Curated annotation (Swiss-Prot):
Species of the source: Methanosarcina thermophila
Quaternary context: Heterodimer of delta and gamma chains. The ACDS complex is made up of alpha, epsilon, beta, gamma and delta chains with a probable stoichiometry of (alpha(2)epsilon(2))(4)-beta(8)-(gamma(1)delta(1))(8) (Potential).
Classification via PANTHER family: ACETYL-COA DECARBONYLASE_SYNTHASE COMPLEX SUBUNIT DELTA, PTHR36214
Name used for this protein in its record: Acetyl-CoA decarbonylase/synthase complex subunit delta 2
Keywords, sorted A to Z: Methanogenesis
Function: Part of a complex that catalyzes the reversible cleavage of acetyl-CoA, allowing growth on acetate as sole source of carbon and energy. Probably maintains the overall quaternary structure of the ACDS complex.
GO annotation terms (biological process): methanogenesis, from acetate; one-carbon metabolic process
Family classification: Belongs to the CdhD family.
Gene3D superfamilies xrefs: Dihydropteroate synthase-like
Gene (name only): cdhD2
A Pfam family reported for this protein in Swiss-Prot or TrEMBL: CdhD
Length: 437
C-alpha cells in the first residue's frame, strides 16, 4: 500500500538540508481531500465539490512548485470525437406547417350595450351625424370579435376664459372668449367627433351664472356646430342638477350627453331631464366598481333610464397619478360586463383631459435641482395625454374627452389603426438604427 504524506511533511523533509531546488525529480501521487464529518450529501453537491477540488489541486501544484517541488496533475480529458456528417441530423427545408386560430372565450357571453349620441334630422334633431358607442363582445381590438364601433373623441370647450397649460392655451387663445367659435375651431380645424361644453361659470364660487344664462351658451354651441355634444356642469353638487336640467330643455331632441349623474348629487333630477328631453346620461363614479354598479342600478331601477341611454365614467387618473388604478378599474368593469354582469354592460367614457393636471405635463422643468431634464413641455404635455388615453383604450374605454389637438390627432390615428379603419404604412425594420420616429 502506498504511503500517504501531507504536503507539510514534504516541506519538513527538506528543511535544514539547504536545498534550493530539485532537478530531474518527479513527485507522483494522488491528492486527497478529507471531507470527514459532513455526512451524506446529494449528487449535485458532490459534483460541485469535485469541480472545486480540481481547482484546489491546481493551487496545490503551484504551491509545490514555489517550494521547488514540481507536482504533476492529471492531463485534461480528450475532446469527444466529431460526429460523422452522415450521422448528423438533416436540416429542415421547410417549417412544419401549422395553423394559428384564435380560441373562443366561453366566459364572454354578454355584449356591451350600444348607445347612440346625437339625433340627426331623421331622428328628430339637427345634428349632422350620430355616433355609436359600445356594442363590443370582447376586449378592445380583439381579433376574434372585432369592435362594431370605433373609439370617439370629444374636445373640451369652456363657457369662460380660464387658466390652461401653455401648450394647450396657444391653440385656443383666440377663441376662449367665444364658446361657439371655440367649438367650431375644434370641429373644423382639429377634427373633433364631438364637443363637450363645460359650464364652469355656473359655480357659485366662480361667477354663479344662472341656469338660464348657461342654457344660452348651450344653444350657441348647438348652432355653431352640427356634431353631437356633451353638456357638463361645474362640479357643484347643488347647482349642477339645476343647470343640466335647463340645458337639457333648450337642447330638446338633440340627444346630448348630460355630464354627469353621480351619487353625491340629485341624480334623479338629471335622469328625469334626460328622459323628458331625449338625452343620454353619463354615470360618474370615482374609481369604485361597486359604486358604479350601485349608481347604474339606481338609474335603471329608480329612475327608469333605458339601458341604451347610460354611459359610464369610472374616473380617469392620469399617467403618474394613478393611471394603473384607472386602467385596472376599467378593465375589471369591462370583463365583468362581458361575463354577464348586467349592471356594468355599458360603454365607458374617460376624462383624458385630466392628464393636464399632472405637473409633469405642463411644468417647464423639475422643481428638484438634482432631477434629470424633463424635455420640452410642448411635446411632453401632449404625450402625457396620449399615453393616458391609449392605456385606457386598451382597457376598454370608448369615448375620450380631450384638449390638445396633437393628442387628439395621434390618439385617433392609433385607435383607428388598431380598429382597422386606417391602413398602417409598412416600416422597414431592418433599418431600425437610422429610422426616424
Amino acid at each position: 500500500m502506498a504511503k500517504k504524506m501531507k504536503l507539510s511533511e514534504i516541506t519538513n523533509m527538506f528543511a535544514g538540508m539547504n536545498v534550493e531546488a530539485l532537478e530531474g525529480v518527479t513527485i507522483e501521487g494522488d491528492i486527497e481531500i478529507d471531507l470527514g464529518g459532513l455526512g451524506g450529501f446529494d449528487p449535485m453537491l458532490a459534483a460541485a465539490l469535485g469541480q472545486e477540488s480540481a481547482v484546489l489541486a491546481q493551487h496545490f501544484a503551484r504551491i509545490a512548485g514555489m517550494f521547488g517541488y514540481p507536482v504533476s496533475v492529471g492531463a485534461p480529458a480528450a475532446a469527444p470525437a466529431a460526429v460523422s456528417p452522415a450521422l448528423a441530423a438533416p436540416k429542415l427545408k421547410d417549417l412544419i406547417p401549422a395553423k394559428f386560430e384564435f380560441s373562443n372565450i366561453e366566459e364572454w357571453t354578454t355584449q356591451v350595450e350600444e348607445v347612440p349620441i346625437g339625433n340627426t334630422s331623421a331622428d328628430g334633431g339637427s345634428r349632422g351625424k350620430r355616433i355609436l358607442l359600445g356594442g363590443e363582445k370582447a376586449l378592445p381590438f380583439f381579433p376574434d370579435a372585432p369592435m362594431p364601433n370605433r373609439n370617439q373623441v370629444t374636445i373640451d370647450v369652456f363657457d369662460m376664459r380660464l387658466g390652461l397649460a401653455k401648450a394647450v392655451k396657444e391653440n385656443y387663445d383666440d377663441v376662449m372668449d367665444n364658446p361657439g367659435e371655440w367649438a367650431k375651431k375644434n370641429v373644423e380645424k382639429f377634427n373633433a367627433d364631438m364637443i363637450t361644453i363645460h359650464l364652469i361659470s355656473t359655480d357659485p364660487l366662480i361667477k354663479d351664472t344662472s341656469p338660464k344664462d348657461a342654457a344660452k351658451t348651450v344653444e350657441e354651441v348647438l348652432q355653431a356646430v352640427d356634431v353631437p355634444i356633451a353638456i357638463g356642469g361645474s362640479g357643484n353638487p347643488q347647482k349642477d342638477p339645476l343647470v343640466l336640467a335647463k340645458a337639457a330643455e333648450v337642447a330638446e331632441g338633440e340627444r346630448c350627453l348630460l355630464a354627469s349623474a353621480s351619487l353625491n348629487l340629485d341624480y334623479a333630477a338629471i335622469a328625469e331631464a334626460a328622459l323628458k328631453y331625449d338625452h343620454d346620461v353619463l354615470s360618474w363614479t370615482q374609481l369604485d366598481m361597486n359604486a358604479q354598479k350601485e349608481l347604474n342600478r339606481k338609474l335603471m331601477k329608480q329612475c327608469n333610464v333605458p339601458r341604451d341611454r347610460i354611459i359610464m365614467d369610472p374616473t380617469t387618473a392620469a399617467l403618474g397619478y394613478g393611471l394603473d388604478y384607472a386602467y385596472t378599474n376599467m378593465e375589471r368593469i369591462r370583463l365583468a360586463a362581458l361575463m354577464g354582469d348586467d349592471e356594468l354592460t355599458f360603454p365607458m367614457s374617460s376624462g383624458t383631459t385630466n392628464a393636464w393636471g399632472a405637473r409633469e405635463s405642463w411644468m417647464v422643468s423639475s422643481p428638484l435641482k438634482e432631477d434629470s431634464d424633463w424635455g420640452p413641455r410642448e411635446y411632453r404635455g401632449p404625450i402625457w395625454e396620449i399615453i393616458t388615453g391609449l392605456s385606457l383604450a386598451i382597457a376598454g374605454n370608448d369615448l375620450f374627452m380631450m384638449m390638445h389637438p396633437t393628442s387628439v390627432a395621434v390618439l385617433k390615428h392609433m385607435t383607428q389603426t388598431l380598429f382597422g379603419s386606417i391602413e398602417a404604412e409598412p416600416v422597414d425594420i431592418a433599418n431600425w438604427i437610422g429610422a426616424e420616429v
